[in-house]
Amino acid sequence: MKTGYLWAIASALLVTVAQLLLKIGMSELPDLQLEKQWFDLHWLWANIIPISVVFVGLIGYVLSMVCWLLTLRTIPLNKAYPLISLSYVFVYILAVVLPWFQETLSWSKTIGIIFIMLGVWLISQKTEQTTSH
């Protein structure tokens, strides 16, 4: 397997972790009134854990972007880009399996995930080179 494919999978996994952390962090924060609370040190300190979780999620996005840039150095875009959609698969599975999210398994979502995986597989297949006469 090319190194670029490993970077693409790492990017999708990091996006997955980032999404899950953002969901956890934002779910724990009280409703935001941005004009007041971001400058209130008491509010910030009282919510330091969920804010930290959100911040780590944002770092996950940055690391994912680094992996993605490394992917683009070695893989054609039409092969690399579909691999990003694997994050949909990972997020769905983890949101159903991990108890913090309490997402429900459904047939329609599962079939959609199967189609995504099938599409990624089809696009990643080598294409035959045809010559024109």
Swiss-Prot record:
A single GO cellular-component term on record: plasma membrane
Keywords: Cell inner membrane, Cell membrane, Lipid A biosynthesis, Lipid biosynthesis, Lipid metabolism, Lipopolysaccharide biosynthesis, Membrane, Transmembrane, Transmembrane helix, Transport
Chief localisation class: membrane
Pfam families for the chain: EamA
Membrane topology according to the record: Multi-pass membrane protein
Gene Ontology MF term list: carbohydrate derivative transmembrane transporter activity
Residue ranges annotated for the EamA domain, each copy included: 51-125
Stored InterPro entries: EamA_dom, Flippase_ArnF, Small_drug/metabolite_transptr
TM stretches of this protein: 6-26, 48-68, 81-101, 104-124
Positions on the Periplasmic side per record topology: 27-47, 102-103
Cytoplasmic side: 1-5, 69-80, 125-133
Cellular compartment(s): Cell inner membrane
This protein's pathway: Bacterial outer membrane biogenesis; lipopolysaccharide biosynthesis
Entry function: Translocates 4-amino-4-deoxy-L-arabinose-phosphoundecaprenol (alpha-L-Ara4N-phosphoundecaprenol) from the cytoplasmic to the periplasmic side of the inner membrane.
Subunit composition and interactions: Heterodimer of ArnE and ArnF.
Family: Belongs to the ArnF family.
Name this polypeptide is given: Probable 4-amino-4-deoxy-L-arabinose-phosphoundecaprenol flippase subunit ArnF
Upper classification of the organism: Bacteria, Pseudomonadati, Pseudomonadota, Gammaproteobacteria, Enterobacterales
Gene expressing this chain: arnF
